[in-house]
């Protein structure tokens, strides 16, 4: 417990809440350009080749974003929309690329959960 004198000298500081996606700067999504598209391996106990892209955002940040779904058409200089949301088994990946917008096409032949992957309703 601080004394009255200590509280007069320096007041109590409010607890600042830390954002989980600082590069978005409070926006729901941000546009960016892919600088590198590559695969990385997840941490233990999982095993795979997860597709990720290094993206330079309009806010000036350079981030690593996950490419969801099976198959993609992204390459260097592709313009993508990025949303928040981490990938639990990929350390440092705190963003997702939105499929079906800008240069990222939707997942082909997707039947369920189509809205999350930018897939149109099959005829």
Swiss-Prot record:
Keywords: Chloroplast, Plastid, Ribonucleoprotein, Ribosomal protein, RNA-binding, rRNA-binding. GO terms for biological process: translation. GO terms for cellular component: chloroplast; small ribosomal subunit. HAMAP family: Ribosomal_uS12_B. With S4 and S5 plays an important role in translational accuracy. Located at the interface of the 30S and 50S subunits. Part of the 30S ribosomal subunit. NCBIfam families: rpsL_bact. CDD domains: Ribosomal_S12. It comes from Phaseolus vulgaris (Kidney bean). This is Small ribosomal subunit protein uS12cz/uS12cy. Its main location: plastid. The gene is rps12-A. Belongs to the universal ribosomal protein uS12 family. One of its GO terms (molecular function) is structural constituent of ribosome. SUPFAM superfamilies: Nucleic acid-binding proteins (SSF50249). It holds the Pfam family Ribosom_S12_S23. InterPro entries: NA-bd_OB-fold, Ribosomal_uS12, Ribosomal_uS12_bac. It comes from the Eukaryota. It is found in: Plastid, Chloroplast.
């Amino acid at each position: 417990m601080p004394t009255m004198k200590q509280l007069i000298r320096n007041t109590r500081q409010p607890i600042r809440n830390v954002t989980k996606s600082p590069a978005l700067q409070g926006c729901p999504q941000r546009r960016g350009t892919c600088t590198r598209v590559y695969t990385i391996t997840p941490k233990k106990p999982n095993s795979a080749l997860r597709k990720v892209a290094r993206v330079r955002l309009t806010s000036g940040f350079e981030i690593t974003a996950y490419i969801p779904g099976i198959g993609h058409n992204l390459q260097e200089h592709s313009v993508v929309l990025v949303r928040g949301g981490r990938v639990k088994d990929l350390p440092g990946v705190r963003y997702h690329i939105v499929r079906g917008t800008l240069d990222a096409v939707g997942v082909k032949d997707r039947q369920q959960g189509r809205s999350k992957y930018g897939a149109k309703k099959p005829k």
